């Protein structure tokens, strides 16, 4: 019985991982669809589509899946029509939360997001109710093996980046929104494809959470991220290492 139970647990975890991977693929395909329709279907002349393809590489989406998504987005009929929507609100302990969505039904998505906030002790606010607490920036990440810290810093600053942070594992470059695509293209031509390249919301200050509040905030974020319409979730919290270890136990 123990072996059988262990097998069931392994299969349950694998099933959960497969479901999460499928949801992530669906989000990437939705972004490819919108970006392909927002300009030419050629990534060489469509910066947003290039960023979507970079996201697809980040999650190991097969190239033929990407190609089919682009073809479907720009073909006859073109399928679903998605609207870009941003929701803002407060979670437990006053944590500020930004939710970015692509939806074909605004009423459904708004109701789902509002329900998630309410269930976990938060409240959905008005547009711009919390975004003033964040900065919108471009983030480009390369593995440390792509080049030395000095080479990456020099190339990034020359290309117009705002900052570079290098560790033993990665180089992370931040840019303004306006310079993001240009900086990414320059660095990609020199160092190869980045591990990740996206626009991000970075908090100016963070809220430190105890174990109870951290658990509630993480549950809220999980529910939001598992929603098919939600593309990304950002929040201004910090969880101390000892609290994170206790939650993982």
From Swiss-Prot:
Coiled-coil zones: none
One Gene Ontology term, aspect cellular component: cytosol
Entry keyword annotation includes Zinc-finger: no
GO molecular function, one term: DNA binding
Protein's GO biological process: regulation of DNA-templated transcription
Alphabetized UniProt keyword annotations: Cytoplasm, DNA-binding, Transcription, Transcription regulation
Cellular localization per UniProt: Cytoplasm
Pfam family, one: Transcrip_reg
Similarity section: Belongs to the TACO1 family.
Cited PANTHER family: TRANSCRIPTIONAL REGULATORY PROTEIN YEBC-RELATED (PTHR12532:SF6), TRANSLATIONAL ACTIVATOR OF CYTOCHROME C OXIDASE 1 (PTHR12532)
Protein name as it appears in the record: Probable transcriptional regulatory protein GbCGDNIH1_1097
């Amino acid at each position: 019985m123990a072996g059988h139970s262990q097998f069931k647990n392994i299969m349950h975890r694998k099933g959960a991982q497969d479901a999460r991977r499928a949801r992530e693929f669906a989000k990437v395909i939705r972004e490819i669809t919108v970006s392909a329709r927002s300009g030419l279907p050629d990534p060489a002349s469509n910066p947003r589509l290039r960023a979507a393809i970079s996201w697809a590489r980040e999650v190991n989406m097969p190239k033929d899946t990407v190609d089919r998504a682009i073809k479907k987005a720009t073909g006859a009929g073109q399928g679903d029509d998605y609207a870009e929507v941003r929701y803002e609100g407060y979670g437990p302990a006053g944590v500020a939360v930004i939710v970015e969505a692509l939806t074909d039904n605004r009423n459904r998505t708004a109701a789902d997001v509002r329900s998630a906030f309410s269930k976990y002790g938060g409240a959905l606010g008005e547009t711009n109710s919390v975004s003033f607490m964040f900065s919108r920036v471009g983030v480009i990440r390369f593995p440390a093996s792509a080049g030395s810290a000095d080479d990456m810093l020099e190339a990034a600053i020359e290309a117009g980046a705002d900052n570079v942070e290098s560790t033993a594992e990665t180089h992370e470059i931040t840019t303004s929104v306006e310079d993001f695509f240009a900086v990414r293209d320059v660095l990609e031509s020199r160092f190869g494809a980045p591990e990740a390249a996206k626009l991000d919301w970075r908090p100016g200050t963070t809220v430190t959470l105890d174990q109870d509040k951290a658990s509630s905030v993480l549950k809220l974020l999980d529910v939001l991220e598992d929603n098919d319409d939600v593309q990304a979730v950002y929040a201004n919290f910090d969880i101390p290492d000892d609290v994170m270890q206790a939650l993982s136990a």
